[in-house]
């Protein structure tokens, strides 16, 4: 092969390799998922890749931010491992841990570059990654995962456990009237006060019952899916598993009414109660319907336990490079006055500030290297052309 052809091939190879190198250097993906450690939703785990190394003398620090931007909780300094990855967990052993419910108390997350050493009390450096859970989504996520300290997902599990306890007491007795009393209590817990089989003489139940909590989770998750594309997959799983829990609970209720309350033979009652207790356990833990060795978030399998974990997943932060838009304090709506001559004060206009530029992801020398590679490739192409032309003239001469 002639020298000219070799030079031209090298130039083409340089041009083809250049875009791949740039794309690799700029790729970033990151999530921060909330889970239980010592308390409900008190821990968050970061999984990041394609992370740019912090500037000399600085470190990356995570911050959870409240809805009103007033409270900022440091999740600690992060170490960028080889391969530009970060794996970091904030939990009960971390500095600054209080056991607070992170879903209930926060809705935004930023990662900033801070001076190396002690983590400051509040973020002061440049924001390099961020995510804000949409306002319309966070309220419904909390309704399922954390409202009132528990949310409908935990309330569902609590009520199912109470129903199982009553049925277990019914099975433990040999007195027919006591069996029926405990069974009625279980039915009341499942149906709630508005149920067609509810009987207050056997025990008043506060709240909305198992079926009510399951439906509340279904309804809230549907609104989450409509409000946030990032949370839709988890919201769909909440709906599937809550529907499964509701179906199992309804079956337990129906069998309690049709089998337990109508039976007078104690031996047969024991069989029926064992069956109903098993169905309630399905409503809690789910059922391996296809016998594949696992209980998944699919129709007929996963139930209340998976409602809760998928509710937490709806609150996962899917980080983006750069800083978020500046926080704007909501303007209060003026209250109408009965005095006709009163002139409402004009609402102050918030002047938007420029959004900070996103961080440089990858090595800072990438743009310079790209220009140098382009110049080298052009030089090789021109040089190869000159050599090729010279060889042809020499051959023709």
Could you tell me what each predicted segment is?
Residues 20-25, 329-370:
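Ser/Thr-rich, Proline-interspersed low-complexity disordered segments
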Residues 26-60, 64, 174:
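Short, surface-exposed binding/anchoring microloops in extracellular/periplasmic proteins
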Residues 73-83:
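Solvent-exposed serine/threonine-rich low-complexity stretches and specific carbohydrate-binding patches
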Residues 98, 111, 129-333:
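Mature extracytoplasmic or organellar-lumen-exposed domains after removal of signal/transit peptides
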Residues 108, 113-124:
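Short acidic/polar inter-strand loop motif in beta-rich domains
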Residues 376-397:
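C-terminal membrane-anchoring or membrane-association module
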